[in-house]
Amino acid sequence: MRHVLLVDLGTGNTRVALADSAGTIWDMRTYTNSYYRDDAYEDAQYFLPAEWEERILRGCRELCEAHPEIRVSAVSSAGARQSFVLLDREGKAFYGLPNIDNRGRVFMDQVPDPEEVYRLSGKWCTEDFGAAKLLGLRQRRPELYEKISQVTSISEWIGQIFTGRTVMEPSQACESQLYDIRERRWSDKLCRAYGVDPAILPPLENAGAVLGPVLPKWREALHMAEDAVFIVGGADTQIALRQTEIRPGDIAVVSGTTSPVVTLMKEAFYDPRQRVWTDANLRGEGYQVEMNPGVTGLNYQRVRENLYGDWTYEELEAAYEQKTDFACTASFSSLLFYQRRSLRKGGFFLPSPLGAGVDRVDLIWAVLADIACSIYEQFQNLSDLTENRAPAILGCGGGFQSRALCQMLADLSGRELVLRPGFEQATVQGLIQLCDETMGEPSLHADGTAIRYTPRKEQLIHRYYPVWLENRNHANGVC
């Protein structure tokens, strides 16, 4: 039995976990990620790598000190997609460009031949990806841009901290929009389109590869095994999907801050209408075709904190079970993916005048139903476009801890929803599996039986969906 330290860098928070090769999570620390606004842009945010590094290493120290009997054999990490760290000539991380940074938005019309960009990268031209962030940085923060020696993703940045080597995994490289998904290498043509010097792009390294031995200063400080190594992880979505045991032809949903709906394909998928993103899978082996309703789980979390901070999640679930009608609809998801458009207008939609019977449960249930409807809409379009007709939906991520959400999605889709043991911490479980493969440990999975939600007919969510769709579309001018 071996033990591993795992770093899971999300959008809202970062988790550091101590786990063993059998899939048991011994202990965990969670930290809220801090961001700052850059006033040189209308919508730009950044983070300070030194702040994040201090918290991550503190978490590692606390875990190792709390379990002195354990000697860690390996470290690995997964990170949010579209999030990058800039390194200077001394190898110091000096600036972070997170996925929520939109500094490149006003410069996207400078990018030539967007059709070719989509064909090569699998993604339409948008401010979401690393290339656009670098373009925006060069335009208004040249003093920062000129400091760049190398760029890496936040997951491989952890590897740089622990080993001194800078690389990028293909699942993260494709999020830069500078990676050719078919050739599986950095693209000179994409670099020229965005004005990026290819010299700042690091070597590619596959998930599961040993990046190198852990530096002595960290091995000694954390009382690790003498032969402790860092194992390359990758993008958090692709890592989490390992936990679902997804195979080509399956469709899965990762329910978290956002809720990507994905299917795996052996060959690169091209849609001339650009209704999907095609991502590189781990190691560049195969492709992940994606639609995404945008922000979902974060909406529910915020409404709960504001309206129901005094209720537990379990109490809310019990209240949902009693509902037989709905008083309003909600629309807070942020993307109509298959139309390549953001949904800028949202809120609660209620009849006028306001009915006396409307209460807080009606509002928060509507937000949960909004998530289910938004995921279902993406699922249906992805299934039709790719012709992947799997009999079940595979699910993972903390959002699926809501029984009501799970049942709504099963009912709407008419397909069984399957959650395998450990789905709540899917990214950590995916990293454990990856480390086990590299270290030659038996392939074990978290204990327990899969949870299955069987679809039902003529449920409340079936009456809600057409009203939700009409209200959402009317508010946003969707045809």
Predicted features by range, described:
Residues 1-96, 119, 146-147, 219-220, ...:
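N-terminal glycine/serine-rich phosphate-binding loop of ATP-dependent small-molecule kinases
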Residues 5-6, 111-124, 135-154, 159-165, ...:
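Active-site core segments that coordinate phosphate-bearing ligands/cofactors
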Residues 30-31, 36, 98-105, 173, ...:
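Short, acidic/turn-prone active-site loops that include or flank metal/cofactor-
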Residues 64-99, 124-128, 155, 159-180, ...:
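Short beta-strand-loop/turn "lid" adjacent to the catalytic site in phosphate-handling enzymes
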Residues 70, 199, 388:
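Structured loop/turn residues at beta-strand edges in well-structured enzyme cores
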